[in-house]
Amino acid sequence: MSEPRKILVTSALPYANGSIHLGHMLEYIQTDMWVRFQKHRGNQCIYVCADDAHGSAIMLRAEKEGITPEQLIANVQAEHSADFAEFLVDFDNFHSTHAEENRELSSQIYLKLRDAGHIAQRSITQYFDPEKKMFLADRFIKGTCPKCGTEDQYGDNCEKCGATYAPTDLKDPKSAISGATPVLKDSQHFFFKLPDFQEMLQAWTRSGTLQDAVANKIAEWLDAGLQQWDISRDAPYFGFEIPGEPGKYFYVWLDAPIGYMASFKNLCNRTPELDFDAFWGKDSTAELYHFIGKDIVNFHALFWPAMLEGAGFRKPTGINVHGYLTVNGQKMSKSRGTFIKARTYLDHLSPEYLRYYYAAKLGRGVDDLDLNLEDFVQKVNSDLVGKVVNIASRCAGFIQKGNAGLLVDTNAAPELTEAFLAAAPSIADAYEARDFARAMRETMALADRANAWIADKAPWSLNKQEGKQDEVQAVCATAINLFRQLVIFLKPVLPVLAADAEAFLNVAPLTWNDHTTLLANHQLNEFKPLMTRIDPVKVQAMTDASKEDLTASQTDTGAAAPAGNGELAKDPLSPEIDFDTFAAVDLRVALIVKAEHVEGADKLLRLTLDIGDEQRNVFSGIKSAYPDPSKLDGRLTMMIANLKPRKMKFGISEGMVMAAGPGGEEIYLLSPDSGAKPGQRIK
């Protein structure tokens, strides 16, 4: 027998600024099922997580509520922990990034990077709130859109016309925190030299650590050239001060992934047999997996492995990326009652219903998962109650009444029993590959065969016939053993159902290897109902309660739900627009013929764009991210082609190129896939 594997697993850290919703829960359930499967197989698998507890958003919310940030994150952690526990997410440790272990590790990693020459310093110019005495992120600046004139727009984009721009382009800018007029101010910032790790990342991201689709997306960023990453923020800021730099703090995304290490370190400090270096040391032979949503891929597949490499730690074995959650085919919506908090769900329905439905829909790819509430009711009722539990409920009574609850030593269906045994390796492979949907399909196919066999034997009819009692007991004993096999296959997904079944079967906790044996001459306990059907009325009550939960305190944004802790959690989506509004925007593929500096402009580059039959001149505020504009020459990008030309100090701008990121060094020009041609419409 092979040695048990040593595995450390993490999920993305939930942000300690709000409640867990079903989009978040997708990731934690997915991870928990995989961890439970590994433990079920006898492997050492440790699952750690933590609240992501730093940043301006937490500091400002605490101030608004009249409490300290420490009290706020303690309150949120208690809420998160309760939600996870009731959803049966079984962390070995759930910690906080605001902890001494994280402070020590963050400082250690930073100092190693600094001493190795991977940290740069330079001055940047930002808006500053003179009343709050703090620098303002883009989302904390509001003003009049420079494109369409709409008032009360954020510092980087307009919700009315969709334009993106630099905060300095806003007309009549105001601090969203104090209402004061911000002033421009210089500040010394610290940058992680991500380009130092370009070659390593190109090899590592193609080494099987990522799904192919994710590796392809990362390759686009690598091909475009990596930029240095701003890792500092100025006081006041809730986080860790950078060693030796008073008033300078680590940006939340620097210490957040280090929180994985800190949570494990905290567990090691309480568990003498665990060795931190055996899992995180440069030469560690343990496996390390991160489960994340697709919205935070760049942090985990670029910044994080580079930080680990530069600081002398091991890199992840794999990063498992999943998509977003939709409900009834649409973005989660507060007005429709489909933006459902974990607590609201738990107030109405069993967590195992959702665990099974997620498992039945989760493949190994990064596609979005749809929670169709009608299908949810039908599938859970049909598969779990109508198929799996039905086997035991049909047959247990005959054994209790006819043989005092004793299973006879007879296998009445050797071929079917062998088919169940033969299916186990394929189901195990599906679990291992995180293809839970295939594992559930193959398990339910076995349940169908078992039910068909029981229906054919019809013990309820045999029981009425003279002299057929031995056959009744043989059929029912075989059925109970088949039920036991199904429970073994489903245990990582349905731990409560498995525990209740183990109590009925009168057995110790089942392991995966138990599928190779059968119960014979074995005493059962009294059968009690294992699961009830979902009542659609309860689902409706849940959606009604979700409307009451959220519309009282938040306007309806029709927000999509990231199934993790990413950019959307910190910079929510804009309100929905109708199709006609979207259709009015003419998006085109553009070839950058030439990119050049603009004399006298601090933030602008002049781009000459080819859109097929004509060329356009566009000024774009991306200079801070692309200090060498010649590297953009010959690159395809995307532009809004029907913006009214705008007269600027340096000339006429005839459109707008599209980019992502919070600003400063972190601006990422968008590019179409290979094969796109200049002038093609983007649909």
Swiss-Prot record:
It is found in: Cytoplasm. Residues 581-683 form the tRNA-binding domain. GO terms for cellular component: cytosol. A motif ('HIGH' region) lies at residues 14-24. The keyword ATP-binding applies. ATP binds at K334. InterPro entries: aa-tRNA-synth_I_CS, Anticodon_Met, Met-tRNA-synth_bsu_C, Met-tRNA_ligase_1, Met-tRNA_synth, Methionyl/Leucyl_tRNA_Synth, MetRS_core, MetRS_Zn. Homodimer. Is required not only for elongation of protein synthesis but also for the initiation of all mRNA translation through initiator tRNA(fMet) aminoacylation. PANTHER family: METHIONINE--TRNA LIGASE, METHIONINE--TRNA LIGASE, CYTOPLASMIC. Belongs to the class-I aminoacyl-tRNA synthetase family. MetG type 1 subfamily. This is Methionine--tRNA ligase. It comes from Pseudomonas fluorescens (strain Pf0-1).
